[in-house]
Amino acid sequence: MSDTKVYPVPDYIREKAHITKDTYEEMYRRSLDDPEGFWGEQAEKFLDWFSKWDKVYHSDLKNGEIRFFEGGKLNVAHNCLDRHLEQRGDQTAIIWEGDDPNNSEHITYKDLHERVCRLANAMKARGVKKGDRVCIYLPMIPEAAVAMLACARIGAIHSIVFGGFSPDALKDRIQNADCETVITADEGVRGGRNVALKSNADKALESCPDVKNVFVVKRTGGDIDWKEGRDIWYHEAVADVSADCPAEELDAEDPLFILYTSGSTGKPKGVQHCSAGYLLGAAMTHKYVFDYQEGEVYWCTADVGWVTGHSYIVYGPLANGATTLMFEGVPTYPSAARCWEVVDKHNVSIFYTAPTAIRALMGQGNEHVTKTSRKSLRILGTVGEPINPEAWEWYYNVVGDGRCPIVDTWWQTETGSILIAPLPGATDLKPGSATLPFFGVEPALVDPEGKELEGAASGNLVIKRAWPSMMRTVYGDHKRFMETYLAAYPGMYFTGDGARRDEDGYYWITGRVDDVINVSGHRMGTAEVESALVLHDAVAEAAVVGYPHDIKGQGIYAYVTLMAGVEPSDELKKELVKLVSNEIGPIAKPDVIQWAPGLPKTRSGKIMRRILRKVAANELDSLGDTSTLADPTVVDNLIEDRPNK
């Protein structure tokens, strides 16, 4: 289909790039042949150590043992702040862009360091110490980054819960991590509307009697309930303490944070990351995958409630002494030009977002993009799901004016940092492909029996060796870690994703392994069918699932969102069926097409396919938890409008 189109590395990028094709091949080979030497060198280059490690790594994936830089001591906040003060204390660390376009703030490294020390001291004054878990439930405001770094400074372990999660989801996460301290705000602001946070936290905390401290940031000044003795105003707490707080010396393997993965059934699954290996992964990939150059402004549009925000808004950029942009708002408020206006306003060089946002903006029309300059842009990135080639082409040609390489990054909450992605100065691009593995990452494709597949092939994506930023365990449940990730293919990490490797060795992620439809014995990745549907000019977005079919075993059920102003019709349905048939083959023709003005998405933009499968199968009494959806009413509309009643 689109495999044949190749975009070579632009000369102007190659000339200044940190990594070229030759250096990539040489460093990649070395990272596999001499991991001890390679990772030791990178840890010296990217991180500042109080004392050096005894052993570079110990890895036994069969038994779930992963350790890097054992015996070494460092502090993550020191690496993100203190070591930069002499050289770049007055440089902007964080540009905060508020929901309201008139609100923005530049925070220097010196200022950020002081804010972090003050909060660290305020937490210590309330009894928070090394190893304690702290729940952060905040909107996208500077205090979120301050809270993360203040925890890291004193060795407390943060657990961020996305500000859009329900009181129930928050309660489960507070209880699972045994948090005694919560940092929240009165309200958040998003798309021109106030979002309740403190009242949600209060509801959650009714079932969490162990929580002793609740720091409350005053964001809007809205009315909130107050519990004396437990609740404390953030601004008062940080004003009462010293701005001097020495960074705790931590072991390389000491936990840095727990982050709960969405979409898992049953009790929450807390992915636990350690200090040194995680920070090395975040810093290296931030510099090399985005080819970050001194003085550039870097903008990752994620929320800090997701791993992308942890690694590529806060830890990676700040470890590298970069200027990182933090955005409180949404891409379509006050208009669909907002992202590009922010790019122009702050001279953003590198822009990293999700395919779902790209498709939404594409559906709004080109004029919102073309009326802005975007001249400062140099590198574009995508994250969160495979990007269909059409959205890739639009992003490349319309947003990037055909001159900015796109780094299509594949990684997971569990991997801590990017594992498969192009490097701007080294990798020729193919729209829709995550391309090649990062240093030290050895991917493989296996069949369901675990037999490794050679050459061009399709199979389950596994990683054959540990890497520094890999999760170390599921918090409080190592058995679950083993069962979920390491038991399926002993000695390898199972990603849960399917992938195809082409004749050039490029990887194409085909979606979760449970996003495979088996039609009359033919296996088909849902991403493939979705890519065919969105080729049609009338289609903004499509989600495809399997459903029980009397004859074929599984049929193909497509939910289709149309571009603004396009009217649904039977004629259009026929066109779409024909298009898929032409693109992939008659076997891939959708059996059911349902027009869907909205799709059920988590707030990080991931489509909840589990819900789509249930609606398609008419299993409406077992939809499961919908509290993490950005807009739960979408589900009611899908149920109401389903053609298979």
Swiss-Prot record:
Q: Does the keyword DNA-binding apply?
A: no
Q: Any idea which GO molecular function terms this record carries?
A: acetate-CoA ligase activity; AMP binding; ATP binding; metal ion binding
Q: Which GO terms describe its cellular component?
A: cytosol
GO-annotated biological processes: acetyl-CoA biosynthetic process from acetate
Signal peptide start and end residues: none
> Which domain of life, per UniProt?
Bacteria
PTM summary from the entry reads: Acetylated. Deacetylation by the SIR2-homolog deacetylase activates the enzyme.
Cross-referenced Pfam families: ACAS_N (PF16177), AMP-binding (PF00501), AMP-binding_C (PF13193)
Positions that bind CoA: 190-193, 308, 520
Q: Which reaction does it catalyse?
A: acetate + ATP + CoA = acetyl-CoA + AMP + diphosphate
Annotated ATP binding sites: 384-386, 408-413, 497, 512, 523
**List of residues that carry N6-acetyllysine:** 606
Matching Gene3D superfamilies? 3.30.300.30, N-terminal domain of ligase-like (3.40.50.12780)
Query: InterPro entries of this UniProt entry?
Result: Ac_CoA_lig, ACAS_N, AMP-bd_C, AMP-bd_C_sf, AMP-binding_CS, AMP-dep_synth/lig_dom, ANL_N_sf
Q: Which cysteine pairs are covalently linked by disulfides here?
A: none
Family annotation (NCBIfam families): Ac_CoA_lig_AcsA (TIGR02188), PRK00174.1 (NF001208)
Protein name (Swiss-Prot/TrEMBL): Acetyl-coenzyme A synthetase
Give the source lineage, highest ranks first.
Answer: Bacteria, Pseudomonadati, Pseudomonadota, Gammaproteobacteria, Chromatiales
